[in-house]
């Protein structure tokens, strides 16, 4: 946007403002010094919690379509309502959002995401058609199919509930750090984004969404790239949480074993606490007995994670024999055989089949190498 700047009056300036609450002025001249200039009743709108445009909203939004995003953002951040005529104009002008750069839209989306209750913003975005232009993948979650009298839940409203649960957890002692709080909200928004592409009907099970976590994780990179969100560690963090978000739930649905928790901690690494927060937020079942069972099992998972952390899980879960030693021992270059042997040792440690000590791991390594036709003397 490159507006033409011209000299003008205060009235001209106020007419160009996006919303009445931003069109307030204080007189600095003469005997009117300090007087509030409020030609559009902006103070009243502030008091009543209303977002409205000073002039015809179609003109206001046409002048700068990003104002539609700002309208939703202010309503979300301030918990205000959008004035009916202004709200209707959002739908009429939604298509003009296409001329706005992805970076500017992403900036507004991040501000909506960081609001106390971002789901309010997504209600406005969805109902006005703006969301379809920004995140059509999210709109697909609002499609509910019924077959043989069996319908799956509305995954769009479930997603917003999970997002609100994550926001509510921000005040808890185990909440994520300020640096990651925005991105765990994005992970909550995208945690089920792969469900429409994975949806299948089974005559026995009904609707299934197998592998939706992996499909969704792959979608994250494409969405971040399109939305001009950062393609760095932040994106990978969101990807990881989306990919792993079913793991704690699967563990909590059965007997919580040491092996499963060790593998989970190994895969999640330093993001294990954020993953657990997201997964607990994902339990939105209306069946209180089932919900209580999940939460109790999550408590057990957290206890086992805490125990691993106290015992320095990074050292415990990383085999003391590494790839360099394997290559040197068997006179091998970097190759598939080295990777296979490393994985054998890793699995044994994660499953607690052998202690992470040199002697028992060496015995296991030699046994596997012999079956692969490898020897210390000759290598391959």
Model regions: which residues?
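Catalytic cores of the polymerase beta-like nucleotidyltransferase superfamily
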Residues: 1-380
